[in-house]
Amino acid sequence: MGYARKVGWVTAGLVIGAGACYCIYRLTRGRKQNKEKMAEGGSGDVDDAGDCSGARYNDWSDDDDDSNESKSIVWYPPWARIGTEAGTRARARARARATRARRAVQKRASPNSDDTVLSPQELQKVLCLVEMSEKPYILEAALIALGNNAAYAFNRDIIRDLGGLPIVAKILNTRDPIVKEKALIVLNNLSVNAENQRRLKVYMNQVCDDTVTSRLNSSVQLAGLRLLTNMTVTNEYQHILANSISDFFRLFSAGNEETKLQVLKLLLNLAENPAMTRELLRAQVPSSLGSLFNKKEYKEVILKLLIIFENINDNFKWEENEPAQNHFSEGSLFFFLKEFQVCADKVLGIESRHDFQVRVKVGKFVAKLTERMFPKSQE
């Protein structure tokens, strides 16, 4: 009896394993008819700058990056970070089998392959899963599929026409941080489209609140910042974030380097809009902001922050803002820039260990600041 029972358990295990592998194969294999249908709707290439005219600082765009791929799109392999922030929900004894299955389909699941592109009918089924399911692992897998398909320009219109925007946005109310992150990634990829942005603007306040209250440096916080960065590449919806600029400066001061750089991309979009100059100057900044200039390891952060300050200085009109100076409170960015010479002295001092490029940039900015924004004749 003992031997027969063992044989039975082994047989059951083989059947379950074969079934799981077959399901993975069915989900990832390419269909020729899908390929032909998608060829009629578009090339399938990820668009570079999105459909928004006048795009500025899209998410993940770096000055020294020569890649032609879109920097505002987030791509996830179908098996990526399932379950927990460290990896998979599968129990330890199943990890070996899961790894073998992932390796088997890895070649077929790449962002450059049409095998991962779903037809409108399949996208409708995935959206139904997102709308009806309450199980986190199902929601996560479905959102990963949606996010990967939203990386293609023609699919952004299809998902919108299928009513996908409010369905995905509803997931932002979940308490599961992993599911929420995946929902933000889907919305981020969909937001590289003018019509989608127009419809997503109603969720900006919620995304902003979730972003500033999330755990510092968490994946949810970074995903929210990326979405807000994409939503502010044009001037049209920037005013929605006017009351949250102080919170962004707080995140900038407290966050790690990755968070700092992501906040800077968002603030740079705002700083390039003259209509947001007064809102930026009115924002409260932490007293620790000045100490950033004491740390030479933050060279890239300092240089990008100086670009933001230069844009604010260039957009500042003394004649219009002189009567409003009394409306800028102590601790605001206006007063920080007014006392910026203190930070500059630390960078330009004899004992400074800063890079030569940083020293030159700070020196030029102080000269511009004194000439335009705070002329001595007006003090």
From Swiss-Prot:
Start and end residues of each stretch annotated as Nuclear localization signal: 89-98
Region (Disordered): 95-116
Annotated tissue distribution: Highly expressed in the developing neural tissues, neural crest derivatives and hind limbs. Also widely expressed in the adult nervous tissue, especially in the forebrain, including the cerebral cortex, hippocampus and thalamus.
Modified-residue entries (Phosphoserine), positions: 61, 67, 72, 110
Cytoplasmic side: 30-379
Predominant place of localization: mitochondrion
Pfam families, sorted: Arm_2
Protein name: Armadillo repeat-containing X-linked protein 3
Ranges in the topological domain labelled Mitochondrial intermembrane: 1-6
Membrane-spanning parts: 7-29
